[in-house]
């Protein structure tokens, strides 16, 4: 599919707020998830990326954020949040099945955009109020 050259990992701080609960109620999860996506998008915009799309849904997959680097690279972003890293953390919660769904959705979106630009898959993870940006977190040609 598309690849961009590997880049370094960046971290930033995001303050935890008392209202940031991780309730299992479906509506509440959506609201909390949207808040974390907004935080991630703002962080990435401050880092120089431009927003392209948000919550792209296709049959069989969803992409939280689609951003564009200054060099034109299309960046598909998965946003994850966990209260702690106790069970491997937010980034570790993206298993092979989730990666396949992300890749499927990204491939369809990328093709719809003309398929000409390089792209990569990033993860913005929130763990206990700390934001971690994993650039080039995984690749389309990786297996489980």
Swiss-Prot record:
InterPro entries in UniProt: Restrct_endonuc-II-like, tRNA_endonuc-like_dom_sf, UPF0102_YraN-like
One annotated GO molecular function: nucleic acid binding
Top-level taxon in the UniProt lineage: Bacteria
Signal peptide: none
Pfam families per UniProt: UPF0102
UniProt region (Disordered), positions on chain: 1-20
Similarity comment: Belongs to the UPF0102 family.
Listed name of the protein: UPF0102 protein BTH_I3148
Species lineage: Bacteria, Pseudomonadati, Pseudomonadota, Betaproteobacteria, Burkholderiales
